[in-house]
Amino acid sequence: MPQNDHGRLSLGRATPSDLPFIMETERLPGFDKMVGRWTADQHKAAYSNPSYAYLIGTEIGGEAFGFAIIRDLDDPHGNVCLKRIAIASPGRGYGTPFLGMVLDWVFREATAYRVWLDVLADNDRARHVYMRGGFIEEGLLRRAYKLPDESRIDLILMSILRPEWLKQRLTRSTE
């Protein structure tokens, strides 16, 4: 399993036994708005779909702390979507290293050229983490997301390209 620079976190492919943790994390207060949530059947369908990858972040000792769902692994143009990423207990400093580990996996294992995502326009914390991770804001999807209360909110489209990721990796390795 790849480890981050601090050696205390690792990343691997999720197994079916990780789905309860993923669903519990999606159901934490406020996460339905920021992260979204799926039913068990939706997760099982995506998990068994070869165009998806479920990744799980663990601390030393094996305790899960976060997950990521990647989709479009079969995109012929190398455009892979970071569909969902979440940390079960935010504020512990795991977000940025976890995102870096996920990007390393996507660019190495999935051989993506571009990783894209959309984020709620008012989710400043996530946007900050994505920008620190090398993502660039590409545009605004106006009122594109319906919230649980049926109101609508803008999404910000963001991406990072393989050359940007490589440059960032080189910069990190020389620091």
Which residue ranges define each predicted feature?
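Short hydrophobic/aromatic beta-strand or adjacent loop that forms the aromatic wall/cage
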Residues: 52, 153-157
